Amino acid sequence: MLLAGSCDWLEVSPSNEVNEEDLFAKGSGYRNALNGIYLNMSDNSLYGRNLSYGFIEVLGHQYLPEHLKNTGSYYKTYQFLYDDTDVKSFISVMWSKGYNVIASCNNLIHNISEADAMLFDGVEMEKNMIWGEALALRALMHFELLRMFAPSMEVDDGKAYIPYVDEYPVINTTYYTNAEILKKIEADFKEARRLVAMCDVEQHPEWMQYDVRMRGDGVTTDLPDDVFYAFRGYRMNYYAITAWMARMYMWAKDYDAAFSCSEEVINSTYKDRAYFDFINSAELSKDKKDSKSLIFTISHNNVLTDEYKPFTNNGSGRGTSGADFVCAWKR
């Protein structure tokens, strides 16, 4: 369990501010707002590094400590030195960035809930898609913060550890118990799944095929006319939400519900062809990207040049954070 404190983490202050009335006057503004949320989530302080292969994996001791010595703050994280200034900075930034993402979701949800469906090129389907994804991202971010900043359900003491923020602007910040937070997360996920189902399940299940959802290509008749509807694998699609629900239920120790959600994802098909090809370890060695089994991913275009390329140019595996992560990974 991590601790953090801040007073400005519920503000939305983009560097390229656009008047809110202008932004939400057109359907394209809602698209831009949603894309901005995904972009913020790809920041290195969140899924661009620390919530994927960085801080979280170091805490889980997925790296060899002798190689982490070159990373400084990550080596301190490995040793659980939570009072160290650098480690405190990691924790504080994850807290503030996480709730800033939530604030952006709430702003979008607040506006789209009252928007006329005719503003959108895809009318009701597009409105529901954007609305549902924003709800799902709000739930996802709260769940991640709950896992980091509250005790697990194994040792839950019934105390309130984090706020669940579902309004914009924020009037009051109320902290809730694990059980209360999980109930709110579940409600958001369920409503989000209902909303995105119009596109992903009812009207255009073909867009969830691998070639369309991950590559943006495929059989001509399967391709959406508008690229906004393509690449559903990089967005909170119906099956991504269902998979996150399975993860949430596992954490909550509701194993029957977790199994049900997992089974739905695993058995999902289009014209008797599985959406996701979950490969074994031998096949994984042939396909390092393993993109056919990806249910949801966040795009971070610079990760190759920022992390892997410096390592390839430095055979010693020293001097860059990317190199140290590659060398330290426990194979």
Which residue stretches match the model-derived regions?
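Sec-dependent bacterial lipoprotein signal peptides
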Residues: 1-5
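Alpha-helical solenoid repeat scaffolds, predominantly canonical TPR units
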Residues: 181, 188, 195, 261-264
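Membrane-proximal, proline-rich intrinsically disordered regions
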Residues: 7-59, 262
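Hydrophobic-face positions in mid-chain alpha helices that act as interaction patches
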Residues: 32, 211-214, 219, 228-238, ...
